[in-house]
Amino acid sequence: MKLLIHSAQESPIVPLENNNINVIHKDNLDIDQIPNYLYNEIECYDYLEYTEDETLDKLLAKISSKGTLKLKGVDIYQASRNFADGNLTTVDMSKAIANGKRRCFSVHELSEIISSKNCSIVFAGISGLNYMIEAQKND
């Protein structure tokens, strides 16, 4: 089974025939109510930035052995670089890094944190302002 957590107003488009994907808005998710090891894949779009510090550990606990965690969010260094270069207005920068978020990440720091939690980084990269990380649990 797969869990897809998003923060957008509209849900992502998921194939209708694939009923093994649970799509949940970040505001409707109670991570503590999900049994551990339930999902073989969890995908998060702009989710970690809105959460408490221990949420990454809780997400990893919900993934089965050798399962996958995919994360996407705004990379603070990319946003800062684009702002400093004049490619982002103050309003756009505020939307990218603030907008109700509790914290910011960079692809490098988040990759190191995930690696320290018994996971292998399969992919880590940047596209525009966004980081993308795919990790696999080693247990």
Put a short name on every predicted segment:
Residues 1-34:
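Class I SAM-dependent methyltransferase SAM/SAH-binding core
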Residues 2, 117-139:
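Core SAM-dependent methyltransferase catalytic element
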Residues 29-45:
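A short acidic, Gly/Pro-enriched loop at the edge of an enzyme's catalytic core
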Residues 47-48, 73:
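Hydrophobic adenine-recognition pocket in adenosine-nucleotide-binding enzymes
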Residues 53-68:
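A short glycine-rich, Lys/Arg-flanked "PGG" loop and its adjoining helix->strand segment in the class I
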Residues 82-100:
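Short, glycine-/aromatic-enriched active-site segment of Class I SAM-dependent methyltransferases
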